[in-house]
Amino acid sequence: MKVTKADIVISAVKPEQYPDSDLPEIALAGRSNVGKSSFINKILNRKKLVRISSKPGKTQTLNFFLINEMMHFVDVPGYGYAKVSKTERAAWGRMIETYFTTRTQLDAAVLVVDLRHQPTKDDIMMYDFLKHYEIPTIIIATKADKIPKGKWQKHLKVVKETLAVEIGDEIVLFSSETGLGKEEAWKAIHKMTKTKNA
């Protein structure tokens, strides 16, 4: 998809702050510093739309981006950062649970994982959470450029088996450096939005 317009609309922490819109929404989740911001910037053809932080756990709000006046991307705060206090972690949990369980505009989620490593307990928990609430999920296995091409399938198998990926959920090999998987990611996103609104 050709992105001609991408703007941040609002940073929200509670439902009354969410955009008053019927446009489909795609939530983007992932561990702190997994490369989620780089993924968003790459797929939207923007270098600095989403700030890439060297400090894990920096995003503490749901950031809504309006794409081509057609849909919203919702950047969810990164999880799994050990130095976040229990109070902050609990607040984060409540915020995302409220969004995922009440937002009718939500069509699907994108879960960004690092292809180089086995998904963590937090990755598994996040995927299970999405499945518990029956949210269609696209898994973006990023940093593919850091692994020899001949080992991609082996690493994909580990991701698939560790998360126990359900039938219907797609896994897309991705690289923010080379742009690998960009078209496939957009195809998967369109499929999810069309499927739900068909």
Swiss-Prot record:
<feature type="binding site">
    <location>
        <begin position="174"/>
        <end position="176"/>
    </location>
    <ligand>
        <name>GTP</name>
    </ligand>
</feature>
<dbReference type="InterPro" id="IPR027417">
    <property type="entry name" value="P-loop_NTPase"/>
</dbReference>
<keyword id="KW-0717">Septation</keyword>
<keyword id="KW-0460">Magnesium</keyword>
<feature type="binding site">
    <location>
        <begin position="57"/>
        <end position="61"/>
    </location>
    <ligand>
        <name>GTP</name>
    </ligand>
</feature>
<keyword id="KW-0342">GTP-binding</keyword>
<dbReference type="InterPro" id="IPR006073">
    <property type="entry name" value="GTP-bd"/>
</dbReference>
<dbReference type="Pfam" id="PF01926">
    <property type="entry name" value="MMR_HSR1"/>
</dbReference>
<keyword id="KW-0547">Nucleotide-binding</keyword>
<keyword id="KW-0131">Cell cycle</keyword>
<keyword id="KW-0132">Cell division</keyword>
<feature type="binding site">
    <location>
        <begin position="142"/>
        <end position="145"/>
    </location>
    <ligand>
        <name>GTP</name>
    </ligand>
</feature>
<dbReference type="InterPro" id="IPR019987">
    <property type="entry name" value="GTP-bd_ribosome_bio_YsxC"/>
</dbReference>
<feature type="domain" description="EngB-type G">
    <location>
        <begin position="22"/>
        <end position="195"/>
    </location>
</feature>
<keyword id="KW-0479">Metal-binding</keyword>
<comment type="similarity">
    <text>Belongs to the TRAFAC class TrmE-Era-EngA-EngB-Septin-like GTPase superfamily. EngB GTPase family.</text>
</comment>
<dbReference type="InterPro" id="IPR030393">
    <property type="entry name" value="G_ENGB_dom"/>
</dbReference>
<protein>
    <recommendedName>
        <fullName>Probable GTP-binding protein EngB</fullName>
    </recommendedName>
</protein>
<dbReference type="GO" id="GO:0046872">
    <property type="term" value="F:metal ion binding"/>
</dbReference>
<feature type="binding site">
    <location>
        <position position="37"/>
    </location>
    <ligand>
        <name>Mg(2+)</name>
    </ligand>
</feature>
<feature type="binding site">
    <location>
        <position position="59"/>
    </location>
    <ligand>
        <name>Mg(2+)</name>
    </ligand>
</feature>
<dbReference type="GO" id="GO:0005525">
    <property type="term" value="F:GTP binding"/>
</dbReference>
<dbReference type="GO" id="GO:0005829">
    <property type="term" value="C:cytosol"/>
</dbReference>
<comment type="function">
    <text>Necessary for normal cell division and for the maintenance of normal septation.</text>
</comment>
<feature type="binding site">
    <location>
        <begin position="30"/>
        <end position="37"/>
    </location>
    <ligand>
        <name>GTP</name>
    </ligand>
</feature>
<feature type="binding site">
    <location>
        <begin position="75"/>
        <end position="78"/>
    </location>
    <ligand>
        <name>GTP</name>
    </ligand>
</feature>
<dbReference type="GO" id="GO:0000917">
    <property type="term" value="P:division septum assembly"/>
</dbReference>
